[in-house]
Structures are given as structure tokens and as C-alpha cells.
Amino acid sequence: MMAALYPSTDLSGVSSSSLPSSPSSSSPNEVMALKDVREVKEENTLNEKLFLLACDKGDYYMVKKILEENSSGDLNINCVDVLGRNAVTITIENESLDILQLLLDYGCQKLMERIQNPEYSTTMDVAPVILAAHRNNYEILTMLLKQDVALPKPHAVGCECTLCSAKNKKDSLRHSRFRLDIYRCLASPALIMLTEEDPILRAFELSADLKELSLVEVEFWNDYEELARQCKMFAKDLLAQARNSRELEVILNHTSSDEPLDKRGLLEERMNLSRLKLAIKYNQKEFVSQSNCQQFLNTVWFGQMSGYRRKPTCKKIMTVLTVGIFWPVLSLCYLIAPKSQFGRIIHTPFMKFIIHGASYFTFLLLLNLYSLVYNEDKKNTMGPALERIDYLLILWIIGMIWSDIKRLWYEGLEDFLEESRNQLSFVMNSLYLATFALKVVAHNKFHDFADRKDWDAFHPTLVAEGLFAFANVLSYLRLFFMYTTSSILGPLQISMGQMLQDFGKFLGMFLLVLFSFTIGLTQLYDKGYTSKEQKDCVGIFCEQQSNDTFHSFIGTCFALFWYIFSLAHVAIFVTRFSYGEELQSFVGAVIVGTYNVVVVIVLTKLLVAMLHKSFQLIANHEDKEWKFARAKLWLSYFDDKCTLPPPFNIIPSPKTICYMISSLSKWVCSHTSKGKVRRQNSLKEWRNLKQKRDENYQKVMCCLVHRYLTSMRQKMQSTDQATVENLNELRQDLSKFRNEIRDLLGFRTSKYAMFYPKN
């Protein structure tokens, strides 16, 4: 009788040979018996099946008729289908409110009690606010927050408090999943907008926490990474709602209560770009590379030189060359009159970048001249005196060191060392300092003449020349960071940096393999040398190559390293071996052959694959990576801490002297009665300005939030998910319309009535 509920299947066109044979007609070896090993529930009656089917189809009158005619009580309203769903659960899933009200009227309230079924879709510790946040439902969260709901604060992964220890001991998986659910709730854009006064700052902090959690709980790495990306995209989308430069200025210059404040900059209404610096600190590449943010940065970068971008290429080149040639004159003009119109133009970040670059190119030119003016007569002097060009180089080095010291003072050690450019500058300046210090020591201690081959291997002059060579290499490599400003060379420079990081990972594996084979070959051949002359043979520099190259650890390392580049012509089989050395030669050949396979073939190809992956990763996000790196470089020129380039920055400027006198006078006046009153008025003015800025920020943030919500609603209406929801609503409306038509026509049956037993 129930067969009519399902569409019939026509098997007339199917041959009997294509159908599976019954177990009775086949041997036991040809069939496999199937048995349901799961929990077997009691079979529902016909009325119960019709009852659940009517609830699923939204047939209000069929459900009402079944409930009204259930006088004998043979209908179990708590019955469930094959999926374990009862009538109320099915009705809630289909959002049939009229049927749900009908079920509640007929005594189904007990079905609405807290469900203790382990097969339910959510765990018992998931609150409604968590589910609403998971769905990112702004309206439901608004209603729930009016009821003063609360969320448990997630503890750290390694927390050893009593509660965490008890939960871990009881069920560690459930504890980890609950922490993930809490963070999925906290990362909801709707919840962040409703509960946070500064949604952008909260998104930054939350993404950093999630990134750290992904490294600790590697089992849920993908989940935490996706949540961190969600927070980053939310901050980016919120910034994208800004419609003018004024709103961008308010957002990017906002300083939270936890950040240090620049009181002088606040009173002078200077741009500190605190929020942008914070975004770079939290590695918010999506936020920094957003179009609105980049356009605002371009405006600040060029400043009063805004017309430079619209000039032809030839005029741009002429402008850069003119500034690059006359940079000493421009520096002196700024040193004398920093507040003049000409001084303000020089203070523009773009002009500062060109002047600093020209100063550094001059320093590199002096390094080239150093090798050209080298005095051959002092070649064998053990302690040569410093030349004039040495003193010029020392001035530049002192200026660069002073610039690094100022940056270290204002940024802090942690932020200073995070920049690879600062690390390279620190190493380079340290090498130059050590070079000239050793030269001074050698000049004061040694006054003799002797051939260089007779000098001690660690003579101060020789060590100074070696350090100077390394410093020169780093000086030219420092030019790579200037490529960041170019849209063509910038992505290549970023890719090279990522490749160097991957090469460091590869180096750990390669050194282990090299050390392993070096130990084996050294132990095999350390007693095989025949004479002292052959024992002195090291590396690939032997005139008579033999396996005596492997007699020492250092020699074996050199040989195996150059073997990768086919530069170590090492004899694997000794042609002049005596009786009993065949096994030794064979074992050596096997070890070297294995090394060739592992390193030359496998590890080398692995390195190529890693470098290719790194390059492709940067290429896939080329625009984002380049704009983020360029913003980091630009920000270093936005403040007024290092306006003058080396060596002019070591000269005390009138501006610095005025600041020192002003600070000293304020300190002296602060101990007088008038000074204290003036200081109180200044603090009051500063607080009023800070409060006004905070109020403006909240107004702008409210506008951004409302625009973001409007944008999200428009996107939801154009997605497939919104289409499905609209179809469900249409289905419910049609069901209600059908029921109303039946009510008007007095028709109380449905298409399933033929299967219901009549009275």
C-alpha cells in the first residue's frame, strides 16, 4: 500500500543477467550477506509514517486531522523517522510555524525540553548566542545581546587551572572543540560589530591570537587559519566602506588607549598613522594593501610633490637626478631653515627618500674610490695609517649608526629587529666599526715592514681587510630594499627574501646529510694515507687526487660539498691498492654513490621544488605582497625623526636645539606655580582633543558598520544561499496558500488521505 508513495521503477528494459541473483540461487562463495549492525528502532505504524510525512510536507490539515482522529491513542507523537527526527524537529527545520503551533497545542511541549540525545547536531555546551554567531546573524545576535548573554572566556592551550585540567582529563577532544567553537563565535563579524567599540583593533588582535593557536593546536590548523583569514578580511572590508579622505584619516590615525600617544603630534594635528603601523605590526596584509589605504598612503607619500605623479617620464627622471646631485645643498638648506616653505618640501617623505638614497649612493661611490686610491707602497706595511677617504667613510658610518640608534630608541628593540633591513644595517655597521677599530689598533701597535706571506694569519690588518670585504658585500646588497618601491622589481625582491627563508629550512636537512656521510667516509679512509705529502692534501686543491682527500673531517666536508657542483674529482676506486683493500674501496664507492643519489639527485631537486613553490606563492599574491612591503618602507620616512641623511644628521640642527631648549624650559617651569597651572591647562587641552578624536572615530565607525551591513545584505541577496532561502520561503507561502484554499472550499483531505484509514 505504501508503494504508491514512491515513484515506480520500470525494469522491463533490463535483462535478467544484469540484475543480481538472489542468495538462494548462488553459492555461498559468490554472495555476501548484509546485516544492519546499528541500533534497530521500532517500526513506525502507517499512521505515524503519514504523520511524519505530513509534517515534512507542511500539510497543516493532514496533521490536524491525524491529531484530531487519534482518539484511540495508537499514534505516538514522539515517533521518529529513520534519521532520528521527531515531528517538532522536522517542523522547525522546515520553518512551518503554523504546524509547530498546532503540535504545541496538542501537548508536544515536552518535546521542546533540553535534548540530551548524543546524536543531536550540536553539543550541549553550545549556547544560542554561539550558534547565532556561527551563522553570522546580526538580527538574532541583537535580540540575544539585549538579554545580557555572556560567553565563557577561552583559556590558553597550556592553561593548568583547575577547570581546564578537569575538562582535559574528562574529554580533551570536547575541550578543544569547545575552544574552537568559542573562537569561531568571537571571530564572527556580526558579534565584533555589536560588542566592540573598535572593531578593527579587535579584528587585528583576534587574528593574531588565532594565528598563534594554529601553531599550537596543529590538529585544528586549517580551522584556526580560516578564522584568522576571516578576521583579516573583515577589517579590510570595513575599511573599504570609507568614502572620503577625511574618514580614512580618522581611521588610520586613531590611537587606542593601550598605545603610546604623541602629545605634541596630537596638539599640532600631525598624522601619526598609528592604526596603519599597528596593522603592519600584526601583519595585516589585506588591510594595508586595500585600495583606499594605498591611495591615502600615496597622498601622504608625495605630499606637496603631488604633481610629480602626473609628470612625463623624462621630467620625473630629471627631477630625481637634480635632487640626487644637489642633495648636499638641499640638506644644508633644511638644516638652516627647516620650517620654511623650501624646508617643508624637503620634509616630504618622497623627497626624504630621494635624498637618503642619493646619500647612500655617495657612500657606495666612496667605497669604490677606496680601492682605486689604494697606495701600493703601503702594501707591506703592517700598520698603515688611515687615509683621507677613510675619515669620510667614518663620517658616513657614524651617521648611519646614529640613524639606527634613533630608530631603535623610538621603535623599540623588538620592532627594530623585526625588519630585515634594520638587521642588515646593524651587521653592516658593526663590520665597518670593527674594521676601522682594527686598523687603528694595527697602526698603533705595528710599525714594521714585511712580506704579507710572513704575517700572522690573524694579523689585525688582515682581519680588518676581510671584515671590510664582507661589509662591502652587504653594503651593495642593501640596495635590494630600494627595489621595493618598483612595481616590477619589488615582487622579485620579495620572492628572493621568501626563497632565502626556505633555503634556511633546507640547509638544516642538508647539513645533517653532509655530516652523516662525512663521518662515515672519514672513519673509512682516515688511516689510508701513505705519506705526509698526501696527508696534507685537503679538499679539491690536490695535484694528485686520491682517496687520501677523505683522511680528515674538514677535507671530507670540502670534497663532498664541491662534489655537488661536480668540482671535486675524487677517486672512488683506488687504482693502486694492495691485497685486502678491495672491500674498503667497494664500501667507499657505495657510500659516495648513495651520497650522490641522496644529495645530488633528491635533495637538490627538493630545493628547486621548494624555491619554485615560494616564488609561485608570492606570484599568486603579487599585488598584496608588494603593496604591503612598500607600505613598510614608506612608513619609515613618514615621521620627522630622521629627516637629514648621513653625514648631515650628526650635525645638531636649529630645530633640535629649539626642541631641547623648549623641553628644558618646560621642565623648569613645571616646578613653578605658573608652570604647574600652564601644564594643567595643556593637559586639559590635550584630553579634550583626545576625547574629540575618539568621538569622531566612533561616529565614523558607526557609519562604516552600517555600510558594511548594507553591503553584506546586498551580497547575500545575490548568492546561491539567499536563493535557496527564498525558495524555502516561497514553499512555505504556497503551503499556507494551499491550506487557506482548502479551508475556503471546505476540502479537508489531502493527496495523502487515500492512505489514511477512513472511519
UniProtKB/Swiss-Prot annotation:
Instruction: Give the UniProt subcellular location, in the record's own words.
Output: Cell membrane
Q: Which gene encodes it?
A: Trpc1
Q: What does this protein do?
A: Forms a receptor-activated non-selective calcium permeant cation channel. Forms a heteromeric ion channel with TRPC4 or TRPC5 that has reduced calcium permeability compared to the homomeric TRPC4 or TRPC5 channel. Also permeable to monovalent ions including sodium, lithium and cesium ions.
The entry's keywords = ANK repeat, Calcium, Calcium channel, Calcium transport, Cell membrane, Disulfide bond, Ion channel, Ion transport, Membrane, Metal-binding, Phosphoprotein, Repeat, Transmembrane, Transmembrane helix, Transport, Zinc
Instruction: Please indicate if the UniProt record lists Repeat as a keyword.
Output: yes
Supply one GO CC term from the record. protein-containing complex
Give ranges for the Cytoplasmic compartment.
1-311, 346-352, 406-421, 484-502, 611-759
Biased composition (Low complexity) is annotated at: 15-28
Q: Which family does it belong to?
A: Belongs to the transient receptor (TC 1.A.4) family. STrpC subfamily. TRPC1 sub-subfamily.
GO terms (BP aspect): calcium ion transmembrane transport; cellular response to hypoxia; melanin biosynthetic process; modulation of chemical synaptic transmission; positive regulation of membrane hyperpolarization; positive regulation of release of sequestered calcium ion into cytosol; regulation of cytosolic calcium ion concentration; relaxation of vascular associated smooth muscle
Which residues does the record give as Zn(2+) binding sites?
H155, C159, C161, C164
Source organism of this protein record? Rattus norvegicus (Rat)
Q: How does it sit in the membrane?
A: Multi-pass membrane protein
Share the record's PTM remark: Activation of PRKCA induces phosphorylation of TRPC1 and subsequent Ca2+ entry into cells.
Q: How is its activity regulated?
A: May be operated by a phosphatidylinositol second messenger system activated by receptor tyrosine kinases or G-protein coupled receptors. Also activated by intracellular calcium store depletion.
What's its catalytic activity? Answer: Ca(2+)(in) = Ca(2+)(out); Na(+)(in) = Na(+)(out); Li(+)(in) = Li(+)(out); Cs(+)(in) = Cs(+)(out)
Give me the ANK repeat coordinates as residue ranges.
46-75, 83-109, 124-146
- Entry comment describing in which tissues the protein is expressed: Expressed in brain, hippocampus, amygdala, Purkinje cells and single neurons in the cortex and striatum.
Just give the chief location class: membrane
Positions of disulphide bridges: C537-C542
Q: What is this protein called?
A: Short transient receptor potential channel 1
